[in-house]
Amino acid sequence: ISPIAWQNDDLPELTKEYTMEQALQEAREIGYTGVERGQRMPHDTEGLKAYLENANIELCGGWCSGNSLVNNFPEECEAIGQQVDQFVELSSPCIVYAECSNTVQGEIQTPVNGRPKLTRDEISSYASKISEVAKWCADRGMPMAYHHHMGSIIETEDDVNWLMDASSSDLNLCFDTGHLLFGGGDVMATLDRWGDRINHVHYKDCLLYTSDAADDSLR
């Protein structure tokens, strides 16, 4: 489970009363044995390892802010290398990679419809780049789980399909039900199509009337 179930990283004021210690304790009480790395956890490897051991919980992944759209291959590997090595050290089953260059997800005043949109050919070109990075991660012992996300270049069902069609088998998918539904996608159709390449799942709900209202406000 991810600590964002307790703590909103984009709107921290909404959940400031929830401590990370409370989140981890309640996660264990519910029955979870692993959590993703959270922003309020130690970021150094030894500190994070001790922190999780003290909470009797393991690392099961965590967000990685990627910039493969604008970085070349060596630049991107250098940028994410420390986190990849940390996750290998802590035996995480994957790293949850999301493209953050030009994303609007953290810009509260910008509607998600203002996100950068790529053509199919542009996504195919991007898929070649991110496949290289995914292979590099896998060769170091850390499978990549690509997170499609509202406000980013890979948001809609078409975006996901185009990316997965054009990428290598080194690129796996972090299947996020809430983001896909909010983006207007067919959750079950996407699951059926790419199930064999899904290696991490975010089960989230979505208030459809909220997403409909957001769509209406952007027309």
Locations of the language-model features?
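A short alpha/beta connector and helix-capping loop motif
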Residues: 185-203
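Non-cysteine beta-strand/loop elements that form the S-adenosyl-L-methionine
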Residues: 1-2, 95-98, 197-207
